[in-house]
């Protein structure tokens, strides 16, 4: 029984990870007006009857449901494996059915997620840039250059006035536009090290 329980547990673990991916896709695609809207998912069915223009994340929602079912199958396998006595377990039919069913539906869900969603994801570059520019977290990248206190003060002002951090830094003359662009570039902020600083510095 131990091998089947381990196999079923591995499916559950995969389902947890896959479910997280599906939930992240749902979150990142929320829109069109409210929500993050950082990505657009392929439309696989007509949109909402109460919200024209909305594309429902139908495939990620389906994947979440499959992952819940796989978790349930694993719970059944574990309970049935525990129900045996000594070297005999008459629960093998329900153990086998749930392990095979979980494997089958999880495999199909991954195929559908890839072919009907992942392969067609489009980044909303303008929206991503807008959210990055409005985020006060970019002040963290400025700290090595203007100091923590000044960066924190700028972040607070940006939140209070709903203005981009970049505009406030330029207005105060703390850094020139070229240097600021280098520090606040997406590439610089998503690489290891201090944004805008060369590796030999």
Outline where the language-model segments fall.
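Conserved, well-structured ligand/cofactor-binding cores
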Residues: 1-201
């Amino acid at each position: 029984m131990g091998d089947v329980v381990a196999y079923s547990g591995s499916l559950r673990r995969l389902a947890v990870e896959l479910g997280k991916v599906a939930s992240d896709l749902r979150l990142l695609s929320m829109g069109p007006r409210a929500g993050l809207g950082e990505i657009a998912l392929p439309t696989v069915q007509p949109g909402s009857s109460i919200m024209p223009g909305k594309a429902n994340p139908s495939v990620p929602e389906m994947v979440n449901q499959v992952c819940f079912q796989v978790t349930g199958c694993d719970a059944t396998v574990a309970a049935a494996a525990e129900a045996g006595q000594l070297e005999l377990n008459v629960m093998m039919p329900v153990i086998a059915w749930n392990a095979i069913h979980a494997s089958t539906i999880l495999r199909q869900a991954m195929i559908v997620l890839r072919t009907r969603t992942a392969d067609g994801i489009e980044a909303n570059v303008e929206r991503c840039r807008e959210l990055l520019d409005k985020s006060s977290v970019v002040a963290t990248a400025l700290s090595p250059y203007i100091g923590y206190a000044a960066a924190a003060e700028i972040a607070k002002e940006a939140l209070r006035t709903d203005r981009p951090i970049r505009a406030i830094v330029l207005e105060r003359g703390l850094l020139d536009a070229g240097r600021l662009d280098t520090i606040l570039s997406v590439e610089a902020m998503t690489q290891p090290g201090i944004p805008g600083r060369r590796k030999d510095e």
